[in-house]
């Protein structure tokens, strides 16, 4: 097993590395993860997406290697677009307890269908 495969396989989301946020100002962190992959729970075919993470930290920030490894754990999981983005959102919201957070999954088209899933802490039902 190669070292990257080993790191992904052994990654434990319960021990995701987070750091204290020492900044006194409010600010937004924007992270783009352009190589997200999961497998369709129906067909098993791979689905690819770019994940856009934005959050206003409170007391914690996520360490960048930790978010990379966490995202890579989805690589061989059979999970829907909706479930994967909601899981990422809930995990980061629970771990970081940010003042505000948004996670967007912009999935590559498959079968002429383009899906974008967005979860955000200030979600309002559209009228």
From Swiss-Prot:
What's an example GO cellular component term for this entry?
cytoplasm
Q: Which family does it belong to?
A: Belongs to the GTP cyclohydrolase I family. QueF type 1 subfamily.
User: What organism does the UniProt record list as the source?
Assistant: Campylobacter jejuni (strain RM1221)
| One Gene Ontology biological process | tRNA modification
InterPro entries in the record = GTP-CH-I_C/QueF, NADPH_dep_7-cyano-7-deazaG_red, QueF, QueF_type1
Q: What is this protein called?
A: NADPH-dependent 7-cyano-7-deazaguanine reductase
Which reaction is the catalytic activity of this chain?
Answer: 7-aminomethyl-7-carbaguanine + 2 NADP(+) = 7-cyano-7-deazaguanine + 2 NADPH + 3 H(+)
What keywords appear on the UniProt entry? Cytoplasm, NADP, Oxidoreductase, Queuosine biosynthesis
């Amino acid at each position: 097993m190669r070292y990257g495969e080993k790191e992904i396989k052994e990654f434990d989301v319960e021990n995701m590395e987070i750091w204290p946020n020492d900044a006194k100002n409010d600010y937004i962190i924007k992270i783009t993860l352009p190589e997200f992959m999961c497998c369709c729970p129906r067909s098993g075919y791979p689905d690819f997406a770019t994940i856009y993470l934005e959050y206003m930290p409170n007391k914690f920030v996520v360490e960048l290697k930790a978010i990379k490894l966490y995202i890579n754990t989805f690589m061989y999981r059979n999970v829907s677009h909706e479930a994967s983005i909601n899981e990422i959102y809930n995990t980061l919201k629970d771990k970081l307890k940010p003042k505000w957070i948004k996670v967007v999954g912009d999935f590559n088209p498959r079968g002429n269908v383009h899906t974008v899933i967005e979860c955000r802490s200030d979600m309002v039902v559209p009228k």
